[in-house]
Amino acid sequence: ARRQRQMCIRDSRCAETAIITFMTFKELNITEPILKAIEEKGYAVPTPIQGEAIPAALAKRDILGCAQTGTGKTASFAIPIIQHLQMNKEAAKCRGIKALILKPTRELALQISECINDYSKYTQVRHGVIFGGVNQRPQVDMLHKGIDILVATPGRLLDLMNQGHIHLDKIQYFVLDEADRMLD
């Protein structure tokens, strides 16, 4: 027997609640290149946070997600962002950062960047990571080559924005990850 879960999505813009039953990532309408990457990581069934957040994000809804460490929060936002950028031909033509993911520390930013790399490896979506405590020249060079998704720590983001290396006028997706730790 296949494992089934149900979820309710409430949209603040309307009074209706949708009940969706799903079983696998494929049934969440993830595109083939991303599905292949997910399967290579050994995942078949979405976690509860993924099962709720991915369909809502694919429907272009705002998400406020709270879950314990290790429950798949990163995939909950990374997969829909990658898929939207991969499928949006207009976005592909437009140079500039289209998704910004803020993380409080270098270590967490690097972890997210690795996950994005894993999920996007069969797509044309380009990403990069910036953080302080290292020479900024390689990061600036990467930015100038062009990326779609930027993972950043706040300090380095502000530094490179103030120096004119980062422009956020093309941003379509914003993720504030570990928001509680940003305030520490």
Language model feature labels by segment:
Residues 10-19:
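Short, positively charged and aromatic/hydrophobic N-terminal segments
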Residues 27, 33-36, 40, 92-162, ...:
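Conserved nucleic-acid-binding Ia/Ib motif block in the N-terminal RecA-like helicase ATPase lobe
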Residues 167-168, 172-184:
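Post-DEXD/H (motif II) to motif III coupling segment of the RecA-like Helicase ATP-binding lobe
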